[in-house]
């Protein structure tokens, strides 16, 4: 059966920033590439935060998440990799030639010489409020992500959470909302130090260590929340027009252990400096992996992807160059440069 399937040099599971940049670099190394993505579109976790401003990608000014996805997707498609969406991979096996055969939940099958895992923390699912009947407010003014900041202009906003996104949303909403109240279970926030400092210096009301314990409303719309101090038990009712919840995400990575991959803390895949896992021809990049020099920034995932791809290239072609030539030596880029110069001359 496997001989009927098209064989790819590299298959990347995951279409977030790590997966997209790895697909681009795979084209630079002249490898036949396929990207498998669980969602209906590329973007990964950033899809949940399209309005979030990203500051830490080298060479880019502060960029909205949605814009970064668009730019990465355009770059990823430079060498025309095959992209398959709605692919939840459930089965991993080897054929008689030691190629890797992947099967998706919908029955699609994919054959590849090497595999790069760029699945982040697994299929991302927001952690929702564990408050009875909270789901009925999701159609009105209970939010688990911020699609457009203008939705909250002039409103009294309560934000529950203390991670990067909660802090970023607070900073973004303070200038346009009537009021912003941040409720967090801990005294310490998990966001970047500078962003946390900016939030604390703003007019946002910050309540720690507090927990959101109840939602109040008429019909399907919240008009107030109850919060509780976790040490004293003191309760306060706060009137609000919108509630934003960011309690992090959970992802299912159990399938990886079923495949025999060595996992460390939090289920992350252990790799060496070449991004090699304990399985031949299988590599892991981005948030999914852990290694001694790991940098947990988007820029760090790009480096992971480059190193994994170089290892995959040598796995397939042991006599190949260890790294790609600089982009100015790539024939495809020379063609693209001519197109850009032609457009610029008009």
UniProtKB/Swiss-Prot annotation:
Pfam families: Pyr_redox_2 (PF07992)
Key word Oxidoreductase present: yes
Gene Ontology molecular function: ferredoxin-NADP+ reductase activity; flavin adenine dinucleotide binding; NADP binding
Cofactor: FAD
RNA-binding in keyword set: no
EC number assigned by the record: 1.18.1.2
Catalytic reaction(s) noted: 2 reduced [2Fe-2S]-[ferredoxin] + NADP(+) + H(+) = 2 oxidized [2Fe-2S]-[ferredoxin] + NADPH
Similarity field: Belongs to the ferredoxin--NADP reductase type 2 family.
Protein name: Ferredoxin--NADP reductase 1
């Amino acid at each position: 059966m496997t001989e009927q399937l098209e064989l790819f040099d590299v298959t990347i599971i995951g279409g977030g920033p790590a997966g997209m940049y790895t697909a681009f670099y795979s084209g630079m190394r002249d490898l036949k590439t396929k990207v498998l993505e669980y969602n209906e579109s590329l973007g990964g976790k950033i899809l949940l935060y399209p309005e979030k401003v990203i500051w830490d990608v080298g060479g880019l000014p502060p960029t909205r998440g949605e814009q970064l996805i668009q730019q990465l997707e355009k770059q990823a498609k430079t060498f025309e990799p095959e992209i398959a969406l709605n692919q939840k991979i459930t089965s991993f096996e080897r054929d008689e030639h030691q190629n890797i055969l992947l099967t998706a939940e919908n029955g699609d099958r994919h054959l590849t010489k090497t595999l790069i895992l760029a699945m982040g923390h697994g299929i991302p699912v927001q952690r929702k409020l564990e408050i009875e009947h909270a789901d009925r407010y999701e159609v009105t003014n209970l939010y688990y992500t911020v699609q457009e900041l203008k939705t909250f202009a002039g409103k009294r906003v309560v934000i529950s959470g203390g991670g990067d996104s909660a802090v970023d949303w607070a900073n973004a909403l303070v200038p346009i909302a009537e009021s912003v109240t941040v409720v967090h279970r801990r005294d310490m926030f998990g966001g970047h130090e500078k962003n946390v400092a900016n939030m604390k210096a703003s007019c946002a009301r910050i309540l720690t260590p507090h927990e959101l314990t109840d939602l109040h409303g008429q019909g399907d719309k919240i008009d107030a929340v109850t919060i509780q101090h976790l040490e004293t038990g003191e309760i306060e009712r706060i009137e609000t027009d919108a509630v934003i919840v960011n309690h992090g995400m959970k992802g299912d990575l159990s399938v990886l252990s079923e495949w025999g991959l060595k996992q460390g803390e939090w289920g992350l895949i252990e790799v060496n400096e070449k991004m090699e896992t304990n399985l031949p021809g299988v590599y892991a990049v981005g948030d999914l992996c852990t290694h001694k020099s790991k940098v947990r920034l988007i820029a760090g995932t790009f480096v992971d992807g480059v190193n994994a791809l170089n290892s995959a290239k040598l796995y397939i072609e042991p006599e190949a160059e260890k790294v790609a030539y600089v982009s100015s030596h790539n024939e495809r880029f020379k063609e693209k440069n001519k197109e850009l110069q032609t457009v610029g001359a008009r």
